[in-house]
């Protein structure tokens, strides 16, 4: 089963059942014929934004936030970006002071296999591509996402 299908099923189970934690969800997934490692489930939770909310009886229930209004988020993050530049090995994003972490986190949450990861300082984000051969396509992708010329 691919990641998108698995995450769709996770969302469905969390929304339709009172799931208190990862172990319970792992059991529910197994009953559905989906065998997944706990580490993979943790990564899925992080990507999906799954949180544990306290219930009125003092217990916990997993919850998946509604799909964010991606265009609004992109616009807000894009307003924090001053420039996007690259060389042969990496991409640098200059941001308003204090905004690099948010921009880096936004990029980390995108599902682009060509972005290996980001490192953020105060006003600069270093984007590390999966391969140097993808520099121009990753830079174009970032500029498109963040609406930068």
UniProtKB/Swiss-Prot annotation:
Keyword terms, alphabetized: Amino-acid biosynthesis, Arginine biosynthesis, Cytoplasm, DNA-binding, Repressor, Transcription, Transcription regulation
Keyword Ubl conjugation belongs to the record: no
Main location: cytoplasm
Molecular-function GO term, any one: DNA binding
Annotated Pfam families: Arg_repressor (PF01316), Arg_repressor_C (PF02863)
One CC-aspect GO term: cytoplasm
Subcellular location(s) of the protein: Cytoplasm
Domain of life, per lineage: Bacteria
Pathway: Amino-acid biosynthesis; L-arginine biosynthesis [regulation]
Family: Belongs to the ArgR family.
Function noted in UniProt: Regulates arginine biosynthesis genes.
PANTHER family with a match to the protein in the record: ARGININE REPRESSOR
Protein name: Arginine repressor
Taxonomic lineage: Bacteria, Pseudomonadati, Chlorobiota, Chlorobiia, Chlorobiales
């Amino acid at each position: 089963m691919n990641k998108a299908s698995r995450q769709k099923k996770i969302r469905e189970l969390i929304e339709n059942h009172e799931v208190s934690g990862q172990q319970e969800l792992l059991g529910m997934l197994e009953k559905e014929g989906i065998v997944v490692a706990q580490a993979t489930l943790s990564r899925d939770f992080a990507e999906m934004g799954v949180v544990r909310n306290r219930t009125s009886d003092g217990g916990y229930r997993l919850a998946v936030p509604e799909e964010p209004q991606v265009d609004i988020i992109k616009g807000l993050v894009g307003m924090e970006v001053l420039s996007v530049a690259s060389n042969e090995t990496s991409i640098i994003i200059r941001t308003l002071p204090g905004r690099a972490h948010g921009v880096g986190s936004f990029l980390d949450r995108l599902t682009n296999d060509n972005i290996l990861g980001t490192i953020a300082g105060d006003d600069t984000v270093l984007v590390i591509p999966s391969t140097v051969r993808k520099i121009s396509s990753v830079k174009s992708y970032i500029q498109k996402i963040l609406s930068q010329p």
